């Protein structure tokens, strides 16, 4: 079978099932993964997507034929695989998931552990370059075994907080029919909070809303429920739970910048002068407040792969993204929605303030992110704007960033679509609207 090359991405593998990612593709990828990594065992977890059992069969078969022992963890969140691989001395881990993509998709996220303080993500593009290699089956086949590591996993995530410091808050949790519906009830047994559940039944059809919090309308039901119940705050988890979005008591989503600063304030108080990783598309406030709090801000490209790399290189204690991924040094430099959730619980409990009051100090700029602007020629747009705004401070760490004293923008081309992503921020809402209109006109006229 010839595999569609478009499914191999920088950080993972994702495609529509069964057209371009299916049992046969998973089988081939399993064989290539085994041949390349030379691992002896792999921990595999999967999300609740309807195609995940079939993908598991193909993937496991490919690994076993190459002599790899497969340990099937069952339906688990992605941070379960990230943390339980090193915690239990597995050589590697694979999560069957398409994260926040629509129900038609499925995919794989792959990691290695080489007895270091971190896990190593395996690029989908690396697998792509090896997919046509002829591989001889191993003389001795591997075995498959089911394994239950839930007790160890829960012990690990609870180790990030002092449960005695968590107060009886009222929280609306939107699991979106994803894995949070399985994990939050287990967490709830250990905390004094009242959890109001939304869409906890696991369902790969995602019948209630998109698993992507940035999709229009995805958070509407959560926002309404938080206000109606007069809850302390609300929480949205995406499908595989590696992203978490908080909603304050007024029904306003906080997203990545404000959430990262909440975490940074706590971490820098406990670990002064530590490095914290942030992204090129995050608010200028992130850098400024990390410095103000005595930390060392490390700016890097968008994407989990780059977060993990920058954290390792700078021994950062924390990393975050606009997309609401939060990675922790003590979680093997990997992200976890549930560790973030527990830490937010402790922060809010100990503050004796409403969530909206906690983040008020960080709201010093106006910002807009436009995830997709269709263009004919991405490179032409970037080169034109680079010339147009040549009197600003320019850098091209990730796309094009141009900074002025009272406003800035970042433009990043998509790797797979004819679109560009625009982030723009200004000191005032009026200036933001002016500059956004200016940029849109320039891009449209090209």
Question: Where are the predicted features?
Answer:
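An N-terminal, well-structured beta->alpha segment
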Residues: 1-67, 146-170
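Short glycine-rich phosphate-binding loop at a beta-alpha junction
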Residues: 41-47, 71, 170-172, 274-280, ...
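Glycine-rich phosphate-binding loop
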Residues: 91-99, 103-105, 226-248, 253, ...
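Gly/Ser/Thr-enriched, mixed-charge loops and adjacent short helices
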Residues: 106-229
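Phosphate-binding and adjacent anionic-ligand microenvironments
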Residues: 269-446
């Amino acid at each position: 079978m010839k595999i569609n090359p478009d499914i191999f991405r920088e950080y993972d593998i994702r495609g529509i099932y069964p057209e371009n990612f299916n049992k046969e593709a998973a089988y081939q990828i399993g064989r290539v993964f085994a041949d390349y990594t030379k691992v002896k065992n792999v921990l595999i977890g999967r999300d609740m997507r309807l195609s995940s059992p079939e993908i598991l069969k193909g993937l496991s078969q490919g690994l076993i034929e190459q002599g790899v022992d497969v340990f099937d963890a069952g339906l688990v969140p992605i941070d379960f695989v990230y943390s339980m691989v090193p915690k239990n001395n597995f050589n590697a881990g694979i999560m069957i998931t398409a994260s926040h993509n629509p129900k038609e998709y499925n995919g794989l996220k792959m990691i290695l552990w080489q007895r270091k303080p971190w896990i190593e993500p395996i690029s989908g593009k690396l697998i792509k370059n090896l997919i046509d290699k002829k591989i001889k089956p191993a003389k001795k086949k591997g075995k498959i075994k089911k394994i239950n590591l839930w007790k160890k996993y829960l012990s690990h995530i609870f180790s990030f907080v002092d449960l005695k410091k968590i107060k009886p808050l009222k929280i609306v949790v939107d699991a979106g029919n994803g894995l949070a519906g399985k994990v939050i009830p287990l967490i709830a047994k250990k905390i004094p909070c009242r959890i109001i559940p939304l869409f906890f039944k696991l369902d790969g059809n995602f019948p209630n809303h998109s698993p992507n919090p940035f999709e229009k309308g995805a958070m509407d039901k959560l926002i309404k429920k938080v206000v109606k119940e007069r809850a302390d705050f609300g929480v949205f988890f995406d499908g595989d739970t590696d992203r978490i979005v908080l909603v304050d008591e007024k029904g306003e989503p906080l997203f990545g910048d404000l959430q990262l600063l909440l975490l940074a304030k706590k971490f820098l108080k406990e670990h002064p002068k530590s490095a914290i990783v942030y992204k090129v598309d995050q608010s200028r406030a992130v850098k400024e407040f990390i410095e103000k709090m005595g930390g060392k801000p490390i700016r890097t490209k968008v994407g989990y792969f780059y977060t993990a790399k920058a954290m390792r290189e700078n021994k950062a204690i924390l990393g975050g993204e606009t997309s609401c991924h939060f990675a922790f040094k003590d979680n093997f430099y990997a992200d976890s929605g549930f560790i973030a959730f527990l830490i937010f619980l402790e922060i809010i409990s100990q503050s004796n303030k409403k969530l909206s009051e906690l983040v008020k100090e960080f709201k010093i700029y106006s910002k807009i992110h436009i995830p997709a602007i269709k263009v004919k020629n991405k490179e032409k747009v970037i080169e034109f704007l680079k010339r147009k705004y040549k009197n600003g401070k320019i850098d091209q760490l990730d796309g094009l960033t141009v900074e002025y004293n009272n406003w800035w923008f970042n433009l990043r081309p998509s790797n797979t679509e004819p679109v560009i992503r625009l982030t723009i921020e200004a000191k005032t809402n009026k200036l933001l609207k002016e500059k956004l209109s200016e940029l849109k006109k320039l891009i449209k006229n090209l």
